[in-house]
Amino acid sequence: MTKYALVGDVGGTNARLALCDIASGEISQAKTYSGLDYPSLEAVIRVYLEEHKVEVKDGCIAIACPITGDWVAMTNHTWAFSIAEMKKNLGFSHLEIINDFTAVSMAIPMLKKEHLIQFGGAEPVEGKPIAVYGAGTGLGVAHLVHVDKRWVSLPGEGGHVDFAPNSEEEGIILEILRAEIGHVSAERVLSGPGLVNLYRAIVKADNRLPENLKPKDITERALADSCTDCRRALSLFCVIMGRFGGNLALNLGTFGGVFIAGGIVPRFLEFFKASGFRAAFEDKGRFKEYVHDIPVYLIVHDNPGLLGSGAHLRQTLGHIL
C-alpha cells in the first residue's frame, strides 16, 4: 500500500498542497488555494486532507520567509503559527517547515533532463556544490552540497546582498535608486518590482517622467518592441541576472551547476536566450576562465517547490535521494 506525505509550497497569495509518495518521491493531487480565503495555514491543510479523504502522518511545507525557530510569521501574509502546535493539532508524527528556496534547491537532485534548459557551460561535475536563485516577487537564493550521501541545502537571504554595478549605466541606475530608497539590494533590481525599478531609473536618467507600469506591462512592451525604455530595462535585467549568477558561482565554486528558478524568466525565454546573460555570467575579469565551464540551467518543472519539499522530507525520514 502506498504511503503518502503532505507537501506544500506557500507564498504571499497562494498555498499549493499535494501528496508525495514517500517511496518514490512522486507528487500527485496538487491543488492551489487562495491564502486570502482562509484564516490560517492549518485551516487550508485540513480542507485539503478532507477533500482528498487521505490520512497522512508526515508533512513538509515550504514557505517564502526565513525559518529560524518554532514560530513562523510570514513576511508577505498575515499567517503566523507555532510548528509544534500545528503538528500536534494535525496529529502528525513529523512536520517540517522549510524556506521556499530550500525546497527549490532540494528539488534539483530529483529533476530530469526535460525539466531543464541549459545556458552555456559544460557538463556539471558530480558531487560539486550547486547554486540556485530565482526572481519572482523577490529574489531567492540557496546553495546545495552533497555530504555523506545526503544533500544539504544552505539557505540564506542572498537576495539582499548589495547590488554591485559593473558598468557606467548600472552605476547611474544605482545612484538613482539609492536616492529613492536608500540601500539598494540585488532584489531591488532582480524581481518583478525590480524590473519596474530598472525601467523607472532608465527613464529618470534621461530626465523624463516614467509611466506607472507593472512588470507585465514592461515585459509585453519589450517583447513587442514597442517601448525602447522597456526593452532596455529587460535587457539590463538579463545582464544583471548573469552577473549575480556568476557571483554565486564564485562564492562556492558551483561546478555542479547554477540553476534559475522563479516565474519571471520563462515569460521571456527567447529574449533571455538572445540576451547578454551568459556573457555577463562569465564577465569576472581574471576569473573568467574559472566560471567559463560552469553550466547554468533554467528549471522548467511545474512544481519544484512541491518536489523539493517531498525530497527534503524523504531524506529526513532516511531515504537516499
Swiss-Prot record:
TM helices/strands, residue ranges: none
Residues where ATP binds: G8, D9, V10, G11, G12, T13
Class in the EC hierarchy, top level: transferase
Enzyme nomenclature, EC number: 2.7.1.2
Subcellular location: Cytoplasm
GO MF term set: ATP binding; D-glucose binding; glucokinase activity
CC terms in the record's Gene Ontology section: cytosol
Keywords tagged on the record: ATP-binding, Cytoplasm, Glycolysis, Kinase, Nucleotide-binding, Transferase
UniProt record, GO biological process: glycolytic process
Reactions catalysed: D-glucose + ATP = D-glucose 6-phosphate + ADP + H(+)
Family: Belongs to the bacterial glucokinase family.
Physiological role: Not highly important in E.coli as glucose is transported into the cell by the PTS system already as glucose 6-phosphate.
HAMAP family registered for this protein in UniProt: Glucokinase (MF_00524)
Name of the protein in its database record: Glucokinase
Organism: Escherichia coli O1:K1 / APEC
Name of the gene: glk
